[in-house]
Design a protein with these regions (language model features):
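Intrinsically disordered, low-complexity terminal regions
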Residues: 2-273
């Protein structure tokens, strides 16, 4: 529902890169010092972290620096085969990527594969190494976190958030905003404080409920959709178009920015904090 072909292609690419990682946590070995970074990032610039197998957790920093640490765990894979790289942009933003194959390229927008090293793909497919990121972010720094197998959680931040996974739930809270959040297999729960600007917002899943919470009254055009589930909104709305049990288009307040919540299997809720 609303999933672009580009999004679908990126999901399949990520799946091809990551391999069947799922194994029991029992008997897994751990390297809690796989990666560490501490840097100052200017306010309104980004810390972006991309991962394929493992969780990404973000919380507030106590100082004025962004801190990123990573823990590698594995049972039968080679932890040294998974490298973690970072680079800083001219605007002060930082990108951190976990890379499972030599031919994987990571940018601010996505992972890609340059198709070199395909002879090593069978070995890659037996690599069960997971990387869990812990990130601490000071006030005013924007956050972008993406993974494939694992949860994405963001709490205690004050600026824009983009959070996404494929297999796992997403919980994203910002005292400011805006927040964008998505998954395929899992729930989405987003919370925002003030809502400045007029940027459109999107929250989506396929198998899981989607909840977005806002502080105070908002002016927006909302688009809610589910196939197997129900709608709920804490605000009175003016319905636009025909009444459809699977798709609700309505206006909140004076209307304005578009807020889109969608899933296939699950409920869709727009809540007032």
């Amino acid at each position: 529902m609303g999933t672009s072909m580009r999004h679908v292609r990126e999901i399949f690419l990520a799946a091809a890169l990551m391999a069947p990682f799922a194994v029991s946590a029992q008997d897994r070995q751990s390297d809690p010092k796989a990666f560490s970074l501490r840097e100052r990032i200017p306010q309104e610039q980004w810390i972006r972290v991309r991962n394929l197998n493992g969780a990404v957790h973000v919380r507030a920093a106590t100082g004025d620096q962004v801190e990123v640490t990573a823990t590698r765990t594995w049972r039968r894979g080679d932890p040294k085969s998974v490298r973690i790289e970072s680079r800083k942009s001219s605007d002060g933003s930082i990108l951190v990527c976990a890379l499972w194959t030599e031919d994987t390229v990571c940018t601010e927008d996505r992972y890609s594969n340059n198709d070199r090293g395909r002879r090593n793909r069978d070995d890659d497919n037996r690599n069960d190494v997971a990387v869990d990121f812990e990130i601490r972010v000071p006030k005013g720094v924007k956050v972008g976190v993406w993974t494939v197998n694992g949860a994405a959680t963001v709490d205690g931040v004050t600026s824009e958030v983009r959070a996404s996974t494929v297999n796992g739930s997403v919980e994203a809270t910002s005292a400011g905003g805006p927040v964008q959040a998505s998954t395929v297999n899992g729930s989405v729960h987003a919370k925002m404080g003030r809502l400045d600007g007029d940027q459109d917002l999107s929250f989506s899943s396929v198998n899981g409920s989607v909840v977005a919470e806002f502080t105070g009254d908002i002016d927006a055009d909302i688009d809610l959709s589910t196939v197997n589930g129900s709608f709920q909104t804490d605000w009175p709305v003016t319905i636009t178009g025909r009444i459809d049990p699977r798709h609700l288009r309505a206006t909140l307040g004076k209307g304005g920015r578009r807020i889109h919540l969608s899933t296939v299997n699950g409920n869709v809720e727009l809540r007032k904090r």
